[in-house]
A protein has these predicted regions:
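A conserved acidic beta->alpha catalytic loop
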Residues: 42-51
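Conserved donor nucleotide-binding strand/loop of the catalytic core
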Residues: 54, 58-73
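Glycine-rich, basic loop-to-helix element that forms the pyrophosphate-binding segment
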Residues: 69-86
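Cell-envelope/extracellular polymer assembly enzymes that use nucleotide-activated donors
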Residues: 6-8, 37
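Short aromatic/hydrophobic "clamp" motif used to bind/position activated sugar donors
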Residues: 91
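A recurrent flexible, glycine/aromatic-enriched loop bordering the glycosyltransferase active site
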Residues: 135-151
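Conserved donor NDP-sugar-binding/catalytic core segment of glycosyltransferases
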Residues: 99, 103-137
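Short, acidic, metal-binding catalytic loop of nucleotide-sugar glycosyltransferases
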Residues: 25-35
């Protein structure tokens, strides 16, 4: 059994339901801290996201917030909204189209523990060359045939 989580997972989303489902499923399936708090902020969604969160929050142990804003706060505002509600030592922000791998959270946590000063740890995007731009900053290009089932 895993120890209590020092991390809260956070996603801010807008109209990205098919990928949001995969992101949430991958976090709960592949995280070391499977019981970590998980906050979702959904703003001005019209694609069924609000309803899906209402129907599936118990299954995935989600704390979710649905906002309808005349002036959208956007992803940055949504991340700040989530951060204000975190009570753990660390926050892991994810985009709603991320798919995480096994023990991804433990790897990041272990890396943070190597540093005594406040540290910012981030990941690289790993994808096939979908945009015909192999020099995209922060992107690691892999051959299409090795990428996996979600290509």
């Amino acid at each position: 059994m895993n120890q209590s989580s020092p991390i809260t997972f956070c996603i801010s989303t807008w109209n990205n339901l098919p990928y949001l489902k995969l992101a949430i499923q991958s976090v709960r399936k592949n995280s070391y801290y499977k019981d970590a708090p998980f906050i979702i902020h959904a703003e001005n969604c019209t694609d069924g996201t609000d309803e899906w969160l209402e129907q599936n929050s118990d299954q995935y142990d989600l704390t979710y917030f649905i906002e309808k804003n005349e002036i959208p706060a956007g992803i940055g505002g949504g991340m700040n909204f989530c951060a204000d509600r975190v009570t753990t030592d660390y926050i892991m922000f994810l985009h709603s189209d991320f798919y995480v791998t096994k023990d991804w959270d433990k790897s990041c946590y272990d890396e943070m523990q190597k540093h005594s000063e406040p540290t910012w740890v981030f990941s690289h995007r790993i994808e096939p060359n979908m945009f015909n731009s192999p020099q995209r900053p922060g992107t690691v290009i892999v051959p299409k045939d090795t990428f996996g089932a979600y290509y």
